[in-house]
Amino acid sequence: VTKHDRQAAHRGIRQSMSGLHTWTGLLLGWVLYAMFLTGTVSFFKEELSQWMRPELPRVMQALDPAVVAQRVADEIGRIAPSATQWSIKLPEGRSNSVYAFWRLPVAQDARGFGEGHFDPVTGRQVEARGTLGGDFFYRFHFQFYYMSPFWGRLLAGLAAMFMLIAIVAGVITHKKIFTDFFTFRWGKGQRSWLDAHNALSVFGLPFHVMITYTGLVTLMALYVPWGERAAIKTPAERQQLMAELNAFIPPGNPAADAALLGSIEAMVRQAQMRWGTSDVGRVNAANPGNAAARIAVTRGDAGRVSMSPDYLEFDGVSGKLLSVHDRVGAAAETRGVLYALHIGRFSDLETRWLYFIVSFMGTAMVGTGLVMWTVKRRQKLPDPERPCFGFRLVERLNIASIAGLSIAMTAFLWANRLLPTAMADRAFWEIHVFFIVWGLTLLHALLRPARAAWVEQLWAAAGLLALIPVLNAMTTQRPLWHSFAVGDWVFVGTDLMCWMLALLHAVLAIRTARQGARVRPPRSLAKRDALPTMSGEAAT
């Protein structure tokens, strides 16, 4: 085998990987972009949820979780005395309220459950506007909406697999990828798009691999269920598996005798002696108000690089510690660590910002890859002014998926401030607004020339984002100047971030419009001298 043969074989492998990289990145690229962007926002979902519920009081001082848990448990006992189960999520520094969920007999409530937010200072339920807050983006990024969560998660897993293949193929394809990381040629059309794509890819390459692989691991039992089905044969084995994956109270029949719950505060105190004063995340109850009551006190996520369950189980009446669940098998612990790396709940503020920034770069990596596909292929079209249907479809989907998604996410925030607070099914109507606006951006992209659609939608996103602080000042008692004066940094940070994102979209709109204003070359020179813009159209 000669040197020439080896070089030819190497080129053949790289060319094959190039095609694999291109098509795995494109076919589900629009889904991946939406997953990346909504996942990026989800790193601050607790803060976004606070902003979307301005009625909830701002908590100024650190509170004792044991006292808060007792207050809220007493309140649930008052407002839902027939609840068969309840769960209290305690604030861990990033939340200004306590969230609780309880199950009710169907005869009493057609839904079969109740939920609410509680003031940690008083323990009383707070009437806040109906919204999913940041949890909508969190859920959307791995199970989407308007479809069964099962099929949504399968689609997300398929997209993640495509992403992992595209990353590996991209590294093989770009033999000088690390060298090109230090090279950026501004204003060079296709070369500039490739340089930006390479830089965004290489800078966050370890993160992109980690976040994609760990995303698959979190739902591994859904994607590869056969091993679990073969290993788990009995209900007892199923319960043991559940206990290794979540805080799990074995289901039991209520006893014939009613009995008051023991001191929740005392049970939480026992947990604090093991984990620390502020490291309690949740309190669950089964059969409260019954002699068979059980209480589980679960450790919080902060500062713990594992999502494996760590909890204490108590007799709900006597308060006696029944069992300690602080160890799981090697496989479950590996899964717990990878899950924790994916969602980053262990992180402090600085680490969370690092997650956000690198994930935002991953979003841009996917976006530049989608745009580069149209940039490269327009030059190869027989008539770039009259592209084929497939090319036009990709181009319009790019516009709606990138610029249109920014508009839709911003419209979701606008709906939060403008919809009547007493509106029925308000939380769902916020989501409906998101999808209605997103659909309208696709319609707009189909009806307008590509470059005009890019510019108009980028400007629309910039304008809507820039006006959010104004809208917030007009519709709540927490405008930017007041929030800054009292140190309400969640509201300050949200308003400032909206302005920063508005500036980013404005810069992109201006640059795309300037490219479009350049004079076109003669058709005979177009192929040789084309300088593609964001829409992929030639300009010089």
Please state what every model-predicted region is:
Residues 1-540:
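Conserved histidines in hydrophobic membrane contexts and catalytic metal-binding motifs
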